[in-house]
């Protein structure tokens, strides 16, 4: 009788554990799909809205799917217009924009932090460690793709972790490589790197030339036309090859940096490109 009682209690306990396990699984799965649904809706708004709707109209739509955006909308007077516009074109920047009032006066980071030796790190122009800092007539988060791309290459090739996007941007701007109303000059790619110990050389656009440079361990910075990466102009870094496709570090997007890209997809979007090596 004692054994039967213990067995029944054990079965009841196992049933409870199984029941709550199922509840937790369903809850977690539901939350995952809900987050996926929200992200899809936000991406659809970003992809299908027009300039005629205005920044406020787009934010109002987006606020229906994320409480953080709703908070930004309710306190929009605390945010520069360029940051609000950034949010309407890149939902990855939600937390960066949200934290602006609290962190806008923080000093920029002195280093990029931990990196892996021999690898080109992914750095983002809207990283809170430097993204709120001024660059030209805006912020690094908004128009700092050039300095951030160069910073990735410098840190990866030289392991100089103090060559942050902010430090590269400061040097570039002081030496005339920021063009007001346009952004980073292409000359930055061949001229600025030498100060930080790297050399940039313009190379021809071609599948073979890109593959050869990457196989030699030479990262490539590309100036991009409107397309998958930008609606205006942008810089990205090609860091290597995998399964016949190109690995990209996009200073404005973690998601695009996680993808592998066919050369044919990138070819028509590349406006110019530079390969980089160390000077020493």
Where on the chain are the PLM-derived regions?
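Short, Lys/Arg-enriched, disordered terminal segments
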Residues: 1-15, 280
């Amino acid at each position: 009788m004692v054994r039967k009682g213990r067995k029944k209690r054990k079965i009841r306990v196992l049933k409870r554990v199984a029941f709550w396990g199922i509840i937790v699984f369903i809850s977690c799965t539901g939350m995952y799909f809900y987050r996926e649904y929200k992200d899809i809706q936000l991406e659809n708004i970003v992809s299908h809205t027009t300039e005629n709707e205005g920044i406020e109209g787009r934010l109002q739509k987006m606020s229906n799917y994320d409480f953080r955006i709703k908070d930004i909308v309710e306190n929009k007077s605390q945010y520069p217009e360029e940051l609000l516009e950034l949010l309407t074109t890149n939902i990855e920047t939600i937390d960066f924009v949200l934290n602006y009032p609290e962190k806008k006066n923080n000093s920029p980071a002195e280093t990029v932090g931990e990196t892996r030796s021999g690898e080109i790190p992914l750095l983002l122009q809207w990283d809170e460690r430097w993204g709120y800092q001024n660059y030209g007539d805006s912020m690094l988060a908004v128009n700092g793709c050039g300095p951030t791309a160069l910073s990735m290459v410098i840190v990866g090739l030289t392991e100089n972790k103090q060559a942050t996007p902010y430090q590269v941007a400061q040097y570039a701007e002081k030496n005339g490589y920021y063009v007001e109303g346009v952004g980073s000059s292409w000359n930055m790619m061949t001229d600025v790197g030498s100060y930080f110990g790297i050399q940039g050389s313009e190379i021809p656009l071609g599948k073979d030339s890109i593959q050869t440079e990457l196989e030699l361990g030479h990262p490539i910075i590309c100036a991009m036309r409107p397309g998958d990466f930008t609606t205006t102009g942008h810089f990205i870094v090609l860091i290597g090859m995998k399964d016949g496709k190109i690995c990209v570090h996009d200073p404005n997007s973690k998601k695009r940096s996680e993808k592998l890209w066919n050369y044919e997809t990138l070819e028509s979007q590349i406006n110019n490109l530079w390969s980089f090596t160390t000077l020493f």
